[in-house]
Amino acid sequence: MSFTVVIPARYQSTRLPGKPLADIGGKPMVQWVYEQASKAGADLVIVATDDQRIVDAVKAFGGEVCLTRDDHESGTERLAEVVEKYQLADDHIVVNVQGDEPLIPDTIIRQVADNLANNNAPMATLGVEIDHEDEVFNPNAVKVVLDKDGYAMYFSRASIPWDRDNYAKSPKEIHHNLLRHVGIYAYRAGFINTYINWEPSALEKVEALEQLRVLWYGEKIHVAVAIDAPPAGVDTPEDLEKVRALIG
């Protein structure tokens, strides 16, 4: 199976400026992500950025990098520019790996590509079972509910499905399987352009979840349970220190 990995990387970050270039064990964060993606069996791994500092850093470690426009409103728009510049065929699989996940397992990068290849949906992603009570009502832990064939019915920051009777008795306990969404996506390249030309939906604005646009317009997203649970990404200086400690 042929697929390409694109790693959108922005220098500006409200909570951690310069995040892609943050040093972890002597290497910039974006290099850790690139190296993990390179193990997944992709034809090509590309860092997509609008910042020359990131371009220089990627070239310094021998990576492929695409300098994009600086007016994109989302990582998906940046992805579309890469698809156009590299003239990827409409049916080619593109995996979007976030640039702030230096410990992402290469196995799940391959898994999400395989997931899309084996389904008719234009888009695929992954989830993991929630095993900690703190995540149940944490709005940053996005939940997803699936139909019988593994297609997403809805994504929400709320606890879904709502177990009415059990939550009434023990509101802080996990009574049934809940699935937390993992923010890695595979797309068919042609669908990316379709997606970015849709107007943002009311639901995605309410939940602040871009993937809800796909469901709003009647398309499907297939969701598989990740074979390896990915560690949390890096959003804050505290997250960065945790990753540095893990790598040693």
Swiss-Prot record:
GO terms for cellular component: cytosol. The keyword Zinc-finger does not apply. GO terms for molecular function: 3-deoxy-manno-octulosonate cytidylyltransferase activity. It comes from the Bacteria. Its EC number is 2.7.7.38. InterPro entries: Cytidylyl_trans, KdsB, Nucleotide-diphossugar_trans. One of its GO terms (biological process) is CMP-keto-3-deoxy-D-manno-octulosonic acid biosynthetic process. Its main location: cytoplasm. Keywords: Cytoplasm, Lipopolysaccharide biosynthesis, Nucleotidyltransferase, Transferase. It catalyses: 3-deoxy-alpha-D-manno-oct-2-ulosonate + CTP = CMP-3-deoxy-beta-D-manno-octulosonate + diphosphate. Activates KDO (a required 8-carbon sugar) for incorporation into bacterial lipopolysaccharide in Gram-negative bacteria. Belongs to the KdsB family. This is 3-deoxy-manno-octulosonate cytidylyltransferase. It comes from Photobacterium profundum (strain SS9).
